[in-house]
């Protein structure tokens, strides 16, 4: 499945990124998200698969397309032949809608896919999260004090706590964790949006980020877990259940224990995981979409678990004219 579909999913995220990038800086995050969703949905139906959206833009009554449970792929076209692989898909057509709307860095189009049952059907709630790279797997505990986790990370990385950089979403709810990190002596990189990109950075040696801590969306947590499976990183996460309607949503999705701490393999247990993302705006991991007179250039990341491949793909999309020139600079 991975070999067959990885480049197909590359097309999906590229088209979503290109559509979103055309709205960059317009100040309308809803429109940016809308065009990314439309582009992703359109290309998704050209992929040779029997796909089901398990994490998307919301419930059926909340989203016109890419809603949870929606069927996508060539298998659902009229008179389609049998035999397409069954695939569960998690999507975020534009992670960082505000980033795109303001032209800020690190907006991406992203999806993860797996065989049936390979991705947790997470409700659209918040999750407490801690994300670390391969060297720190097993060293952190979601219930441990921040200082203890930072000491454990520093020990695994053979450095001082003062050498560490922790990424945290810049939100009022994170005031305590920010103070705890500072009190421990570690440095902080606050980000306005894009905790998925931050999680990937924490798992890549040389990115200058050693951990991500705080509370973010549960759908992004599952997407991050898919990336961690491919990068040998770790995410620990727990749903934030604070209202009766949250309990109802968990029950509807078959989740019985709202206090459970999920490890990476529980959020993304699949054996054939594909993770694909494409830069929309310039970022620390991926370049943004670049438009020029005769085409478009995109920069993407495609990872496959079973094949153990991490590919950075630089694509030039040329205009369909006979006199078009290819440029590499």
Task: Label each PLM-derived region with a short phrase.
Residues 47-51, 81-87, 95, 103-108, ...:
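Short coil/turn connectors at secondary-structure junctions
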């Amino acid at each position: 499945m991975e070999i067959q579909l990885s480049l197909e999913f590359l097309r999906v995220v590229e088209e979503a990124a290109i559509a979103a990038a055309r709205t960059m800086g317009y100040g309308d995050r809803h429109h940016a998200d809308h065009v990314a969703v439309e582009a992703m949905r359109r290309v998704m139906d050209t992929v040779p698969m029997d796909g089901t959206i398990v994490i998307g833009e919301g419930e059926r009554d909340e989203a016109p397309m890419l809603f949870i449970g929606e069927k996508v792929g060539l298998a659902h076209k009229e008179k389609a032949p049998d035999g397409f692989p069954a695939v569960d898909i998690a999507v975020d057509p534009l992670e960082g809608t505000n980033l795109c709307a303001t032209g800020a860095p690190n907006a991406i189009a992203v999806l993860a896919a797996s065989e049936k049952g390979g991705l947790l059907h997470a409700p659209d709630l918040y999750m407490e999260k801690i994300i670390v790279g391969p060297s720190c797997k097993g060293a952190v505990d979601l219930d441990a004090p921040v200082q203890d986790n930072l000491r454990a990370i520093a020990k695994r990385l053979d450095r001082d706590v003062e050498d560490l950089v922790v990424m945290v979403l810049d939100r009022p709810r994170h005031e305590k964790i920010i103070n705890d990190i500072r009190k421990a002596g570690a440095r902080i990189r606050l980000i306005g949006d894009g905790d998925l990109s931050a999680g990937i950075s924490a798992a890549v040696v040389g990115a200058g980020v050693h951990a991500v801590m705080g509370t973010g969306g549960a759908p992004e947590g599952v997407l991050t877990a898919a990336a961690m499976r491919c990068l040998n990183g770790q995410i620990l996460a727990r749903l934030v259940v604070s209202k009766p309607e949250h309990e109802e949503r968990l029950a509807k999705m078959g989740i019985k224990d709202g206090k459970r701490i999920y490890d990476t393999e529980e959020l993304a247990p699949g054996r054939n995981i594909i993770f694909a993302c494409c830069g929309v705006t310039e970022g620390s991991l991926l370049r943004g979409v670049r438009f020029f007179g005769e085409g478009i250039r995109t920069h993407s990341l495609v990872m496959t678990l079973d094949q153990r491949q991490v590919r950075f793909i630089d694509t030039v999309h040329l205009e369909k004219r006979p006199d078009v020139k290819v440029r590499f600079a």
